């Protein structure tokens, strides 16, 4: 599998836990190859216009996401949910960037850094999900917005 195919594999996986599992596995494959002195072919695969998403959370316009007081228990839960959502978007944004720029002659270190960052964001998403679940909630329990992904859409050309 080429690096761009790995990126598209992550981007076309809807479930957050599975998406981050694949992200971690692809990052480990990339790192192992680099440690062995080889470079996985970059390839060229077209990323989807939108990453696959689970059925929840409901995605609202940023102005329509309910405001909550951060000092209240529900406000703290909403903050944790928002951070989990940010982390999942970051996973997609990192892999999207990798898929979009495999046609450019960047040094391998460029891809090393973005693969590492995608892997770290995957870890952060899972930590936030674990935290939400320990509090009796889960990712997707509250609405969120797609504002971060709009930046990728706005720069697709």
Question: Over which residues does each language-model region extend?
Answer:
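Non-heme di-metal
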Residues: 1-157
